[in-house]
């Protein structure tokens, strides 16, 4: 009996140890594509694509690669030379300073090129130093590589918009890390027409290695995957791994996976932080950061622990803490400044958000001929949730909840004067789905979202007893169309009207289910 009891205890302990050695992807919940990560002593910092949302390039911090905290952004406002499409930032630590090499469209011609910003701390503040790679009609997805012999190189994807094969290119980085010297050269060319981007480089033994992403990055048909190549010379030629792709989705948990960077833990483990679309309803949370442990095989090719089939459950980094869950979001606007979680639709509105006296005052000035409102939103961390608020402004402006894709694709539910309205904007056309007299002066409003799609719209006089507004004809296809090719719908608050007549909100809440 004593033997059986001891064996039972040992088996239970073994089970706990085993459970503690796995974590569940994503490790950062919400849309944060193309993540880049560094380790500074025992602390990790990550950033990623912000696309058409400001502030630009969120910065996260972690002590274990698993539990992350949003601590800031690279830019609060876009750099003067840029206009939009803030993609694929690469954060690098060099000689005690921190550099972010980022992709953005140039204001003068809307071509995407690579800029650089510098800070004394990984959290910032960052000072923009302008474009560093201006090559052809497009240069995106920067990666900085130290060859171990005192030389640094910057690589990028080229010719993605031209009628010719895509190339991964590189150039020597100047000693100031703010310029390139010499002529760019080709690392690899996409002669197989699989598409090619999101590269990283490392050197081990006699080889230079490139991990790169292939196929379609974004949207409902994404089949992104990770391939590998190696060469005995930095300049190539590179041979492709016979086992490519070495990491892919296409299963019942992960739809697609790719575009990331490697980081080494204090224990010497190497992890690849990249993004993935989850399969099922959480697809509509966007491209979320995930981790996979990488090792070198006996054949001198990189491989991922657990195999090439990307899964949600993965080997945990040594010493990581218990993985936290997803928390509800609440802002009562009691601070003088916005919480770091908020983002706004900078291409379409000059958004002004002021916290005053426990209320948010939201307004905006349209920046395009078709733009008409200011959206202040958060990233959804799950696909099933409710959002609620209470408009309290005495204004003729629209004060509303929104599920926002962009200026042409949004759901808007709120007060316009004394009317309670639900409006659908799809493909630039606006359709009023409901228009009723406001049942009370300042109703509480709620949208219930299931599987990433709005399912019901409710109002309440007191925030406790809710009344549903009946709707017909709002199809799943229409709701899914609100998601843009490279980003998903964000829930938040909306103002439409004169910039001098702001919307006022008592609170904003996201409750996950």
Walk through the language-model features, giving the residues of each.
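Hydrophobic h-region of N-terminal signal peptides that target proteins for export
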Residues: 10-19
């Amino acid at each position: 009996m004593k033997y059986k009891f001891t064996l039972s205890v040992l088996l239970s302990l073994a089970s706990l140890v085993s459970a503690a050695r796995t974590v569940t992807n994503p490790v950062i919940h919400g849309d944060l594509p193309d993540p880049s990560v560094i380790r500074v002593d025992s602390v990790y910092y990550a950033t990623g694509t912000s696309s058409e949302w400001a502030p630009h390039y969120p910065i996260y911090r972690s002590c274990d690669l698993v539990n992350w905290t949003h601590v800031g952004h690279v830019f609060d406002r876009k750099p003067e030379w840029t206009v939009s499409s803030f993609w694929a930032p690469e954060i690098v630590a060099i000689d005690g300073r921190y550099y972010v090499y980022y992709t953005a469209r140039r204001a003068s011609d809307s071509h995407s090129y690579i800029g650089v910003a510098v800070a004394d701390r990984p959290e910032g503040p960052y000072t923009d130093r302008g474009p560093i790679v201006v090559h052809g009609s497009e240069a995106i997805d920067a990666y900085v590589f130290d060859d171990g012999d005192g030389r640094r190189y910057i690589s990028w994807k080229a010719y993605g918009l031209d009628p010719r094969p895509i190339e991964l290119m590189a150039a020597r980085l100047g000693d100031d890390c703010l310029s390139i010297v010499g002529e760019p050269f080709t690392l690899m060319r996409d002669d197989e027409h699989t598409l090619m981007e999101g590269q990283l480089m490392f050197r081990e033994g006699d080889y230079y290695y490139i991990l790169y992403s292939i196929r379609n990055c974004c949207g409902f048909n994404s089949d992104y995957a990770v391939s590998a190549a190696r060469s005995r010379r930095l300049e190539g030629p590179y041979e492709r791994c016979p086992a490519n792709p070495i990491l892919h989705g296409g299963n019942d948990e992960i739809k697609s996976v790719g575009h990331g960077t490697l980081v080494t833990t204090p224990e010497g483990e190497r992890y690849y932080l990249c993004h993935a679309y989850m399969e099922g309803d959480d697809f509509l949370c966007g491209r979320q950061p995930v981790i996979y442990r990488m090792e070198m095989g006996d054949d001198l090719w990189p491989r991922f622990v657990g195999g090439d089939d990307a899964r949600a459950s993965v080997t945990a980094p040594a010493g990581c803490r218990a993985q936290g869950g997803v928390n509800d979001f609440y802002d009562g606007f009691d601070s003088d400044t916005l919480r770091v979680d908020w983002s706004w639709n900078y291409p379409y509105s000059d958004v002004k958000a002021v916290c005053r006296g426990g209320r948010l005052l939201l307004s905006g000035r349209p920046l395009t001929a078709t733009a008409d409102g200011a959206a202040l939103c958060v990233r959804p961390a799950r696909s099933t949730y409710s959002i609620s608020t209470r408009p309290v402004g005495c204004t003729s402006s629209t004060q509303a909840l929104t599920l926002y894709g962009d200026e042409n694709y949004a759901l808007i539910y709120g007060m316009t004067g004394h009317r309670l309205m639900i409006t659908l904007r799809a493909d630039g056309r606006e359709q009023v789905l409901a228009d009723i007299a406001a049942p009370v002066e300042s109703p509480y409003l709620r949208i219930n979202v299931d599987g990433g799609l709005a399912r019901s719209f409710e109002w309440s006089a007191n925030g406790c007893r809710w009344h549903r507004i009946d709707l017909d004809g709002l199809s799943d296809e229409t709701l899914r169309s609100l998601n843009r090719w490279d980003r998903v719908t964000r829930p938040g608050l909306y103002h439409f009207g004169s910039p001098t007549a702001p919307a006022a909100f008592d609170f904003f809440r996201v409750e996950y289910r």
